[in-house]
Amino acid sequence: MTLLLFDLDDTLLGNEMNAFIPVYLQALAKRMATVADPTVLIKTLMYATRQMVENSSPDKTLEEKFDAAFYPPLGLIRSEVQGIIDAFYAEDFPKLRGLTQFRPEAVSVVEQIIQRGDQAAIATNPLFPRTAILQRLDWAGLAAEHVPFTMIPSYETFHFAKPNPAFFAEFLAQLGWPKTPIVMVGNDIELDIGAARQLGLAVFWINHNGASMWNGQGAIPPYGELTDLLPWMDGSEPKHLQTNYTTPNALLAVLRSTPAALATLTHKQEIKLEQRPAEGEWSPGEVLCHLRDVDTEVNLPRLYKVINEQNPFLAGVDTDPWADTRQYCQQDGLQALTDFTLVRLEVLHFLEALPAEDWNRNARHAIFGPTHLHELVNIIAGHDILHVQQVYEALKSLN
């Protein structure tokens, strides 16, 4: 089984965003003209959108970033104008359908993928409310209530946007880090292909004009029309579709995605995070406590030691018993997530400030032997992935 991540606009749905966005902005400004000057509103909305695109912090959803940058400068309180916005998406946004083009081949390809036992997910840029994304899927003939997409991102549930590779890491983390081959399918060289490649994903570039249009980094990726996707997959060696999260950019994206995805996975859960899925298994809350303490007492001190000392010795630490000795089962899981997010930000800031050569600094590990900082970060990322999978499976079991 392969998981296909599909871009939406100009991949599954004909939609030239350079033409769509100005009309969208004008329509929204007209609807909100009673509460904000249209010119100022459009300018402020574009600024707020940039804040979403540039967000690299896992402690704020894109919706939270947008709200903070959009409503206060306009002197608005969201709750007081939510009715106007809801009316826009219910009455005005559907009229923009005429700017888009239905692509029957997109419906056919997605249907074939589902029928053959592969999975499809929508990897559109989550800069819109969920309703705007669901409506565009409907225009594409791929209504969410009829197609079993494994994921449809939106600004309510995501913390990162394209071209940040952390978007793709968060996407996969929210799916429990699938162990299947994964392919990103999209038309945009930077947002789809370049960003997915930074994480280490296989890609297929939707391109109607041939290889001469390639101006991205690295070798020209596999490309063609949407109808060429399945023949390409069937002719590809499995190893070419495997993920590879090992470059510094990919590892930082994974580390950034962990607290973000855990926040979404645990948000508004009806079960208690301290509830164990089975006897002898950790609860989601215990996992969050574990991640917090390992980052605080093991990972961050080790990273500092490797940078500040010459080929230091790193003692092995058995952290699993902490769950019992520190009574994680009695602790507040959501508070543990908040604390983990804070220390993870310290880890990220530390790593991002390092020159490239410092990733090669050596150390001696009690268990792994001779190692270097790059390998240590790789171990942290792998540890993250295992525990995100654990939380994902626990929540699924408890629900």
What are these model-predicted stretches?
Residues 1-4, 107, 111-112, 127-128, ...:
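Asp-based, Mg2+/Mn2+-dependent phosphohydrolase catalytic module
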Residues 1-47:
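Active-site neighborhood of HAD-like aspartate-dependent phosphohydrolases
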Residues 42-91:
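A metal-dependent, Asp-based hydrolase signature
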Residues 60-64, 78-83, 90-122:
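Short, acidic loop-to-helix structural element flanking the phosphoryl-transfer center
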Residues 236-250, 297-340, 396-399:
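Short, helix-capping/interhelical loops that line the mouth of catalytic, cofactor-
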Residues 243-271, 294-298, 305, 379-382:
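Alpha-helical bundle segments that constitute or directly flank the non-heme di-iron/ferroxidase center
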Residues 264-267, 320-360:
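Acidic/histidine-rich alpha-helical segments that form the ligand environment
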Residues 273-319, 348, 360-399:
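Short, contiguous alpha-helical
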